UniProtKB/Swiss-Prot annotation:
Pfam families from the UniProt entry: DRMBL
InterPro entries from the UniProt entry: DRMBL, RibonucZ/Hydroxyglut_hydro
Organism: Arabidopsis thaliana
Residue spans of biased composition, Polar residues class: 109-127
Region annotated Disordered, chain positions: 1-27, 109-141
Taxonomic path: Eukaryota, Viridiplantae, Streptophyta, Embryophyta, Tracheophyta
Any one annotated GO CC term: nucleus
Name the UniProt record assigns to this protein: DNA cross-link repair protein SNM1
Keywords assigned: DNA damage, DNA repair, Nucleus
Localization, UniProt: Nucleus
Alphabetical GO biological process terms: DNA repair
Biased composition range(s): Acidic residues: 1-11
Function per UniProt: May be required for repair of DNA lesions formed after exposure to oxidative stress.
SUPFAM superfamilies on file: Metallo-hydrolase/oxidoreductase (SSF56281)
Amino acid sequence: MDFSDEDDDENCFGSRFNDGVNEEEEDEEGFVFNDDVEENEEEEGFASDFYKAGSDWSCLVEDEETVSSSVKKMKQSNLFQIWGLQENSPDTTKKMKQTDLFQSWGLQKPSPFTSPASNSAKKTTSALGKRRRDSSFSNDSPRPCPFYKKLPGTPFTVDAFRYGCVQGCSAYFLTHFHADHYIGLTKAWSHGPIYCSSLTSRLLRLSLSVNPSSIHPLELDVEYTINGIKVTLIEANHCPGAALIHFRLLDGTCYLHTGDFRASKQMQTHPLLFNQRVHVLYLDTTYCNPRYKFPSKEDVLSYVVRITKDFLRKQPKTLIVVGSYSIGKECVYLAIAKALGVKIFANASRRRILQSFGWDDISKNLSTDGKATCLHVLPMSSLKVERLDEHLKIYREQYGAVLAFRPTGWTYSEKIGEHLDLIKPTSRGKITIYGVPYSEHSSFTELREFVQFLRPDKIIPTVNNGNAGTREKMQSCFREWLRR
């Protein structure tokens, strides 16, 4: 996507293929080549110099030292011990000890909308069956890994599974379980250890049947030492299990990789971000365009609940449908369920995924009977009049109409902005569909505030970066933000 008015499609598992990974070539700056680049574009300039700088990946060349370090066990340590607070160092030969950094520093950890996985959460490794969508890639001639998926001075890559065995990489990090980020991961994966959040690790086993021996789950807000580099996962406010990844190198250099995220005020209170230096920010720039200024998640949820109640007052026999991806948008249908006091119907595959979260708010409110509740969750691709009409026919004895919500940032309109009451639904016969701008990515204004809060030395966009002109527009925004 460039700075035009055309929206990108999102795939059935969550996000769009956001870094141009379907293209076959890269430009001279290491970005995926885009044919839309103008022929008369200047070869030199800020963007060119910026992206050429620091792109020497000789540090990733595999050598004996790297190979040796890759087989060492991951070490986990407490930040308060490093800072002189009293706590015994964990014995790395014993089972890994988990320490909440917020508790260590005497801070109260913000609670998410839904409950985090408890210690009693069930862990399942059963597979959902074969995926209709093949997320594998050709092993015969895998494309070279783009530089912006590698971390300089480390043997690490982030969300770089479709490139096969990346030379010099001894640790593959996954920010979250959306297909455009895990593409390339299959049960046959054998290229190296995978590091991700605990919830994401359960989804890898459940949905993709990835070998558990390849997966190394990390808890949020716990510092780990991997190949001598300190790594901490931070809540990303995107989808369940999504994490920002904070890397601190031996020389003190700090990288923050956002994966996909929605910036929030709570992030600014995190001990690793508040008054801390970030040298390089790998930024989710999905909506890095001045036209995007989303209403808050809370405002959208309140709007959805109000519309639902108003609709039911007029037509009590209404079936409520919420579109969703494999994961994501849970807050929307959970808000409706709580407001109406009803359970949530989803098919068996989705129920297994939702139950794997270990969140009581969802697990206790799931129904196996579509006739027993008026709230159904369907794939986002099913939110079309024809498909909803077919769905209604199945329950025609209980319901006479359908009210559906398509919650995605791509429904955003500048004319509506934050004025949600201006939204006009699509209505045909017994079907009414509301597109609501419930985004799990940062809006332009939220990106600006986050960048101005962190004030990094360098920003590397990870989305919509396949066009040099678009990159220059984004860099122009970054320069303007950091002047203030």
